[in-house]
Amino acid sequence: MKIKVVDMTYEQALAQPPQVHKKPKKPSLLFRTVLRAASAPDLLATHFHCEKIGMAQIKSDEPCLVLMNHSCFLDLKIAEAVLYPRPFNIVCTSDGFVGKEWLMRSVGCIPTRKFCSDTTLVRDMLYCVRTLKTSVLLYPEASYSFDGTATPLPESIGKCVKALNVPVVMIRTYGAFARDPLYNGLQKRRAKVSAQMQCLLSSSDVAERNVAEINERIFSAFRFDNFRWQEENGVSVSEPFRADGLNRVLYKCPHCLAEGKMEGKGTSLICRSCGKEYRLTELGTLKCLNGEAAFTHVPDWYTWERQCVREELESGAYQLDIPVQICMMVNMREICRVGEGRLHHDENGFHLTGCGGKLDYFQKPEASYSLYADYFWYEIGDMLCIGDHKALYYCFPQGGGDVVAKTRLAAEELYKLKRAAKARG
């Protein structure tokens, strides 16, 4: 999927009219039927089936909040299939509306800016369940998983559930990550996909439980490991390109500690600094081909990278300073490509400069618990996004090296450290 990008100056981008808020629309049965039909070929190709648990507790016309884990674009097609004919609105990243706002609103999408404070979103969700009498589909992770495990959830999810005061449904997919992991560059694998849809919290549960209890129930449901699931269930991924781009996730060598020297190609992951070579097996495990393996499980390697980043932050050694190509989004008409600059990140937060000295944006670590980061964003390139309600800045690292995963890890760990320091007083 591509996106409309227009070259212009930074001043021209700022002069764009701001986005005007519009209330969500209830998707028509015709649109829902068309979307379901359009989703059928991909689902048939994956031999898709869905197990439903406890759904009899929720009436067919009763609005509910549907939470779903986020592995790949197939997730939306799965939701369309398993929820039909229940009408629902979909919380969607605002850049997904660029160049096609009418269509996105017609199918029931609600725009929001990822990892930005957005009180309007809650009001829109309330409007859906109370006025439109529709359910709301929300991907609380707000981004695709890098390593096949759950990404951080917002602590505000429990408050949102209490405000909506409707039942909560969970859709958990199996095999979707194995079919199309984000790091693999949109290359589809042959993998069967299934889902489990269950009533996570009934109306009485929502009414009787406090925010902390609701959070615990939801957070518990979002504990998963797709690589472990693949191994334990004997799911074979035999494609010869299955390790392509794995260096985007496993960017640091655990043997020589070099960063940005890993290369994922074919079925192998090789460190171009020390020569250590791993093979990503058909069952998703790692096998070292020239020595003892430091890790045999992709998420374990990624967790180690997170620990390394945290240690750098605690010691004051962490710093990112890279040249970037900069795009902006002010409204949903287009993405504005405004020039080049530098993105700096350290314990004080993000600092983006560029466009001949005209752009100077600073974002504190406490601004968000995570970071909007993506691989091959709309087929343009790997991307880091910062910004606020006025504008979003999409930064595309230049000059090689895999920095996207590390920067997201650093943003998440820095947020935790700042919160802990504040709690200590």
What residues fall within each predicted segment?
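Structural motif
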Residues: 265, 344-348, 380
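Short, structured interface segments
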Residues: 214-229
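Long, charge-rich boundary regions
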Residues: 277-358
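Short, surface-exposed beta-strand/loop "edge" segments at domain boundaries and coil↔beta transitions
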Residues: 277, 334-336, 356-361, 388-402
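Soluble catalytic domains of membrane acyltransferases
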Residues: 27-31, 44-216, 232-233, 240, ...
